[in-house]
């Protein structure tokens, strides 16, 4: 028969158990608010698209350490001068993150500040006014700190505004002519700064008056327009675009139309003369039907050189995740040189 424990001994064991339980709960809770590594696909699957080289993916938590909700992230922008990543949500939140890389791989992300987007009178944007979808940074790579500006496009009430890094609007909102004919919730998702044509925007889906499967890219000064052929996957839509180092554009498309698989397409587009159709070539077609573990990728930003980040919008759904993924676009000639026999 086992020896009977004294009341003092039982109390001590109970305290030990409670302490261990508390520590474990704290560790589990901490894991739930820190980004974790995530695997999009096997090395064999990734190797099927040699023009895309992956450099790390993180699964972001549903909230930061201070309980600020993380979700609905629709676009991101990299500030090279400040080494900061900005992320906007379709509920009017602006997050600022510090990223960590190890040997070129994305391994961490730490939240620094979160602000609400606010109008020129410092009143927070709410409801349909807060539906931020596109983000592009200005003066973020000029070797001067403290002068960055954020250009943000909104969808439900279509317009473009300029903001300070604190989320305060510093310009009157305006709606460019190129946004005409866009259906509700299919507006200006994509923004980029073109070296020749200035700030460009792209509509998510086919606007009224254009052929099915085509959408519009246009300059915000209303001077230039191009037609853009969407990928052939059912429901494919343009969600983001960024400049490539050689002057072409990197396009991010998402096709989500159940019962078809979720498909994320990374494409290269070349703009010819205004008024013409963009020349487009698919670099990678990532499909959940082929074993890729994807989510609703719709945000994109240029890091430096040929490296980019893309982010997914979890729609604040418990069935989805917010993924932040790093990749490089390998130039065809570079790939040919690397794969040539010795």
Spans of model-derived segments:
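N-terminal secretory signal peptides that target proteins for export/translocation
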Residues: 1-11
């Amino acid at each position: 028969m086992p020896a009977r424990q004294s009341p003092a001994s039982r109390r001590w064991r109970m305290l030990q158990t409670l302490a261990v339980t508390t520590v474990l709960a704290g560790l589990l809770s901490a894991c739930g608010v820190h980004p974790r590594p995530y695997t999009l696909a096997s090395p064999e699957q990734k190797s099927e698209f040699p023009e895309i080289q992956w450099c790390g993916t993180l699964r972001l938590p549903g909230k930061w350490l201070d309980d600020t909700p993380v979700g609905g992230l629709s676009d991101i922008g990299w500030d090279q001068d400040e080494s900061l990543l900005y992320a906007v949500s379709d509920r009017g939140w602006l997050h600022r993150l510090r990223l960590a890389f190890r040997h070129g791989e994305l391994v961490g992300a730490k939240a620094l500040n979160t602000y609400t987007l606010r109008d020129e009178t410092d009143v927070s944007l709410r409801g349909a006014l807060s539906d931020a979808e596109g983000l592009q940074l200005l003066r973020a790579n000029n070797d001067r700190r403290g002068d960055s500006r954020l250009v943000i496009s909104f969808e439900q009430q279509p317009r473009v505004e300029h903001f300070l890094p604190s989320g305060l609007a510093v310009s009157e909102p305006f709606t460019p002519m190129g946004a005409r004919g866009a259906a509700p919730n299919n507006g200006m998702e994509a923004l980029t700064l073109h070296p020749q044509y200035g700030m460009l925007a792209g509509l998510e889906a086919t606007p009224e008056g254009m052929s099915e499967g085509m959408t519009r890219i246009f300059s915000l000064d209303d001077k230039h327009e191009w037609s853009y052929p969407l990928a052939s996957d059912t429901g494919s839509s343009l969600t983001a675009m960024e400049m490539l180092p050689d002057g072409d554009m990197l396009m991010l498309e998402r096709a989500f139309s159940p019962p078809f698989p979720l498909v994320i397409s990374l494409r290269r587009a070349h703009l010819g003369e205004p008024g013409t159709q963009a020349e487009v070539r698919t670099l990678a077609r990532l499909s959940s039907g082929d074993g890729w573990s994807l989510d609703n990728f719709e945000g994109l930003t240029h890091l430096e050189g040929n490296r980019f980040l893309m982010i997914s919008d979890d729609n604040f759904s418990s069935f989805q995740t917010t993924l932040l993924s790093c990749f490089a676009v390998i130039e065809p000639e570079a790939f040919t040189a690397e794969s040539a026999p010795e």
